[in-house]
C-alpha cells in the first residue's frame, strides 16, 4: 500500500546512533553495536511525523506496514529523488536495512527486511517528539536482531546435524564394503593356497609314477619291482577315485543340461567331455595293467557287485547295449540297425576273447603240470626253469587280453556316440552312470547288512 513521505533538509541539529553503514556500491551489510560517538553524516530527525532523506541514508516513518515489493521500492525511490514532500499520519520509526546506493545514492527497500522491521515498528510506537531513541525501542530492535541470529544459528545447526548423519551413514557403508572386500580376499587367498597344495601333490605323484615306470622298464630286482608294483597299484586306485569324483560332476552337468532343454551345440560340448573322460579311464587302466595285471583282472578297485558282473577287468559291451536299447528312444530304423550290428560285433569279440582266455588257462595248466615237482637234480632244475619260462611267456599274453577287452569297450562307446544324436547320446551316458550307481549302492547295502 502507498505511504506518505516528507523530505526534510538536512541540518546538523539532529543526531542519532547508526546501526548500519555501507561501503561503496556493494550490497554488503555489516552489523555493529551502537557507539558512544555521533556521526554527522548519519544525523536524522527522529520526530514522530517527519521523514528525512539524505544523499547517504534514508529513514522513513509509516502509519502501517509497508508493502516492500518490487513496485513499492521503485515508488519510494521516485519520491525521494523527485523531492516530494508528504507527511505520515503516525510517528512510527523504522530503520531500513538492506538499502544500496543506486546512481546518486538513493536506497531501495529490501522486502524481507521491511517485513521484519514493520513488525518491530508496531511494537515501538512513540507519543512524544524526543531527539533520543527510547530504551525500549533500542531493546526491541536489538531483540529482533538477536532473534534473527538465533533462527539462523538453529538452521545452521540443523544443516550440520543432517550433514553429520549422512557422513555417518556413508562411513558405515564404507566399513561394510571394506569388510566384504576383506572376506573375498581371504577366500581367494585360501583358494590359491589349496590350489598350490593340490598342484604340489600332483607333481609329487607324477614324479613317483615316473620313477615307478622307469623301475619297471629297467627290470630291476624283484624286491624293488614288487615295491614299484605296490606303489603303482596305490597310485592307480587314487587316480581312479579322483576320476569317479570328476565323472560325477560331469554327469550332474549333463543331467542339468538335458533337464533344462539345453541347445544341441551346448549339449554336444557336455557329451564330448563325458566321452573324453571315458577315454581317460581306459588310459589309466592301461597304465595299471602294466604295473599289476592280476590286480586289474581281479577288479579289486571296484565294489563287490561290480566285480560280480566284471569281465576281463570291466563291463561287457554287449550287455551294456542291451540296457541302452530299452531306455534310449525313439530310434530311427537306421539307428536300430546300427545298434544291432554293434551289439553282434561286440558279442563276437567278447566270445573270441573269452575263448582266448580259456585257451590260455588250459595252456598254463598243461605247462605247469608237465614240469617236475621240484628241482632235485641238475636235469630237473633245467627242466623246471624251462617250463617256468614258458609259463611266464604265456602269462605275458594276459596283459594283451585285458588291453583288447578295454579297447573293445572304448570302441563300443565311440560307435554308440556316432550312431546316436547328441540328445540321445546324453541320455545314454546318463543311463550307463545310473546303472553303475545302482551296482555301487547294492554293494554298500550288502556290506552294511547285519551279520548274525
Swiss-Prot record:
The gene is PAN. Residues 192-206 are annotated as: Leucine-zipper. One of its GO terms (biological process) is DNA-templated transcription. Residues 233-449 form the DOG1 domain. Transcriptional activator involved in the determination of floral organ number. Acts to determine floral organ patterning by establishing floral organ primordia in specific numbers and positions. Plays a role in regulating stem cell fate by directly controlling AG expression. Binds to the 5'-AAGAAT-3' cis-acting element found in AG promoter. Might represent a target for a post-translational modification by GRXC7/ROXY1. Residues 166-186 are annotated as: Basic motif. Keywords: Activator, Coiled coil, DNA-binding, Nucleus, Transcription, Transcription regulation. Residues 164-227 form the bZIP domain. GO terms for molecular function: cis-regulatory region sequence-specific DNA binding; DNA-binding transcription factor activity; transcription cis-regulatory region binding. Disruption phenotype: Mutant plants have extra floral organs. The modal numbers of organs in mutant flowers are 5 sepals, 5 petals, 5 stamens, and 2 carpels in contrast with the tetramerous pattern of the wild type. It comes from Arabidopsis thaliana (Mouse-ear cress). Belongs to the bZIP family. Interacts with GRXC7/ROXY1. Interacts with BOP1 and BOP2. This is Transcription factor PERIANTHIA. GO terms for cellular component: nucleus. It is found in: Nucleus.
